């Protein structure tokens, strides 16, 4: 009898994965989703933190369920938010890094989102806090209305910061309007050479951490309303007021906090309250915000009728304040995991994930199920009794059974995980984790104190052990990729790549299938594997733009300024890996000078080749750098029309690429390199263009050369 009962319960829980959770006579729960920023696995008390106190977050775990194997689909902010809202892996759309402040809306307005899904079931929907997914159809010029935006993705109401607390513009947006802006003083984006006229913003000290200077002029009143030290208080007040104003309809509140993203600017009441400096004080402010939301639900009388989910967009970042918390107070933001934000190691994407729903979720319970933030779409569809079509379930898996029960088997067959670099796209299946390259695939700064300190150097610095790392560097002879048994070795101390070739082969097949789905620009053929480093090699084609003269000529800069376009480095910035160039020289928009010690993404401009007339065949070359809309190489007709183009993969390493020239035989063409980005991965590197053509001595007439 007992065995029969257990079998019946197991069947009922497992069947939830395939059938709607709510029936017609069920009252749908309210849903509150709190999405913290850069909160690491070890930043919360219920996940082992001892230098901070998080009673409100810990209460959610005490009254709900804590997951120990939850992940963000990306170890980076923008793509993680894309995955959360759409249920789609962001790499499929070429989204690898943070979007530029002027970025268009990255989410197709025809795509189903969790807000649209819930709105179809009668939910009131709102979004508060960090957006960082862009506005508008093309480049955002900040002219009102800011559409498409949150309201076009299913949110009835939005109030928050348009980008992030570390990047401009430093203003609030309400729905599709900039709060406090008037028609006679509009917000204006300023080009780099005009930024002496920016509008003043809240002054900060070095101790608060990294913040990008303002790039905008105008909107003086809007800027005055934004204060870094009251940002969290403002968003909490707006969110709780919205809860208080709800009527009888169920509601969905998505609160994307700016805590604990740099700069670390806790309100005065929280300063000095933790045992790990401003880093911990900011966590205390985050915990207070969670408490305010819970108090609002209780005051409204709906706390027991609300599913509350608390999680983070990615792992903790070892920035200046993270280093201060470790060096001076012993706080380990990602617990004993290897790695940090941006990287493929566990510390980059294993995140806190807690769900509370009285009467449905067992209080104080823990789940070891493998889940991901990309799974919320399918899970909320099941919760509200809405079937998804097959296309909408490709990446998002219904993990609701793991929230409300104890499934005996894994709900996910495998999970694709994306760090900042496309070369390090990874796959998790069961206990196995394959990272298809060496190192972390994230930031690679080698010196403590810097904002980008991470990778092997930082791992050694904090005392992590890994069989591939010796004294902060990847050891000579280390395997070309990484395989870890996370069941036996969650800290990723031993790379088993050479010991289990069959497992590597199986997981690599899954990765190859995933890579084949990545959105590519028309006509561009770029591999996801690094091009090999080779010596200067005379080509057998009639044209060779390989920059081996050490000079830019015959190419020209037609827009912007660059410090050192023709590079000759033998190793990459940060991680020290060998530069995979052809010969000695290459063209890059990353280097400010010949002896620069770090990259300079702030440079922008356009570089063009002379005109040429293709004779057929293909053009082969290498491309590296950012994967965003603002950094790319393009093949153009003489009138400037871009007919083929390609981007990097958010990696300094160059990828093989080729363009088919046969459609353009006899036409005047040119190559254009565009860098319009000034933030992370805001650069382009190209090398070794080989093709058959007649090179002309003139340039496109529409471009004024410098």
Tell where the protein language model's regions lie, with residue ranges:
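Extracellular beta-strand-rich recognition modules
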Residues: 547, 619-625, 669-675
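Beta-strand acidic-aromatic groove motif in beta-rich domains, primarily in extracellular
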Residues: 557-558, 619-620, 629-635, 682-684
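Extracellular carbohydrate recognition and processing domains
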Residues: 636-669, 674-684
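Formylglycine-dependent sulfatase
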Residues: 2-16, 20-482, 490-528, 534-536
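Short beta-strands within extracellular/lumenal beta-sheet-rich domains
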Residues: 587-619, 629-631, 654-658
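Extracellular carbohydrate recognition
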Residues: 603, 677-694
């Amino acid at each position: 009898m007992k065995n029969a009962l257990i079998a019946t319960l197991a069947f009922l829980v497992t069947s939830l994965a395939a059938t709607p959770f709510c029936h017609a006579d069920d009252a749908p729960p309210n849903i509150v989703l709190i999405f913290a920023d850069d909160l690491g696995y070890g930043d919360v008390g219920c996940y082992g933190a001892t230098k901070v106190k998080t009673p409100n977050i810990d209460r959610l775990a005490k009254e709900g369920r804590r997951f120990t194997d939850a992940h963000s689909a990306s170890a980076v902010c923008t793509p993680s938010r894309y995955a959360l809202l759409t249920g789609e892996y962001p790499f499929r759309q070429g989204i690898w890094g943070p979007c530029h402040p002027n970025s268009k809306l990255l989410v197709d307005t025809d795509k189903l989102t969790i807000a649209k899904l819930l709105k179809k079931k009668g939910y009131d929907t709102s979004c508060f806090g960090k957006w960082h997914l862009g506005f508008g159809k093309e480049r955002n010029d900040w002219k009102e209305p800011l559409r498409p935006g949150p309201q076009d993705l299913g949110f009835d109401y939005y109030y928050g910061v348009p980008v992030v607390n570390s990047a401009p513009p430093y203003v609030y947006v309400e729905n599709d309007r900039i709060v406090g802006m008037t028609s006679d003083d509009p917000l204006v984006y300023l080009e780099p050479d005009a930024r002496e006229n920016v509008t003043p913003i809240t002054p900060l000290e070095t101790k608060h951490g990294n913040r990008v200077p303002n790039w905008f002029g105008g909107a003086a009143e809007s800027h005055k309303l934004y204060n870094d030290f009251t940002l969290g208080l403002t968003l909490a007040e707006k969110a709780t007021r919205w809860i208080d104003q709800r009527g009888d309809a169920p509601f969905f509140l998505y609160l994307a906090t700016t805590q604990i993203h740099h700069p670390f600017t806790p309100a005065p009441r929280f300063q000095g309250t933790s045992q790990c400096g401003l880093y911990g004080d900011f966590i205390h402010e985050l915990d207070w915000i969670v408490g305010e939301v819970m108090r609002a639900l209780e005051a409204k009388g709906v706390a027991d009728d609300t599913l509350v989910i608390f999680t983070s967009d990615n792992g903790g970042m070892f920035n200046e304040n993270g280093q201060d918390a470790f060096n001076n107070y012993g706080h380990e933001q990602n617990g004993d995991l290897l790695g940090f934000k941006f990287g493929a190691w566990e510390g980059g994407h294993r995140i806190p994930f807690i769900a509370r729903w009285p009467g449905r979720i067992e209080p104080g319970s823990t789940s070891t199920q493998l889940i991901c933030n990309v799974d919320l779409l399918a899970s909320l569809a099941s919760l509200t009794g809405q079937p998804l079509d097959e296309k909408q379930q490709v990446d998002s898996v219904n993990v609701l059974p793991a929230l409300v029960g104890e499934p005996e088997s894994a709900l996910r067959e495998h999970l694709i995980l994306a760090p900042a670099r496309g070369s390090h796209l990874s796959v998790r299946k069961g206990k196995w984790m394959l990272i298809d390259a060496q190192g972390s695939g994230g930031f690679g700064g080698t010196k403590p104190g810097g904002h980008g300190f991470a990778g092997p150097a930082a791992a050694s610095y904090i005392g992590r052990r890994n069989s591939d790392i010796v004294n902060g560097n990847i050891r000579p002879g280390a395997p070309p990729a990484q395989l870890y048994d996370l069941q036996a070795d969650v800290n990723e101390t031993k790379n088993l790549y050479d010991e289990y070739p069959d497992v590597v082969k199986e997981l690599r097949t899954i990765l190859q299938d995933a890579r084949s789905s990545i959105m590519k620009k028309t006509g561009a053929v770029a591999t996801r594997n690094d091009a090999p480093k080779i010596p200067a090699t005379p080509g057998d084609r009639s044209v060779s733009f390989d920059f081996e003269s050490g000079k830019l000529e015959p190419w020209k800069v037609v827009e912007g300024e660059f410090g050192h376009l023709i590079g000759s480095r033998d190793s990459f910035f940060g991680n020290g890996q060998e530069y995979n160039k052809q010969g000695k020289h290459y063209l890059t928009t990353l280097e400010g000078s010949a002896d620069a010690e770090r990259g300079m993404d702030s440079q922008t401009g356009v570089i063009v080749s002379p005109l040429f007339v293709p004779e057929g065949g293909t053009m082969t070359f290498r491309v590296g750098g950012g994967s965003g809309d603002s950094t790319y190489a393009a093949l153009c007709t003489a009138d400037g029309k871009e007919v083929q183009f390609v981007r990097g993969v958010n990696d300094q390493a160059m990828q093989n690429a080729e363009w088919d020239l046969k459609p353009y035989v006899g036409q005047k063409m040119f190559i254009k390199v565009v860098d319009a980005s000034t933030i992370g991965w805001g650069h382009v590197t190209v090398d070794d263009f080989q093709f058959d053509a007649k090179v002309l001595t003139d340039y496109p007439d529409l471009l004024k050369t410098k």
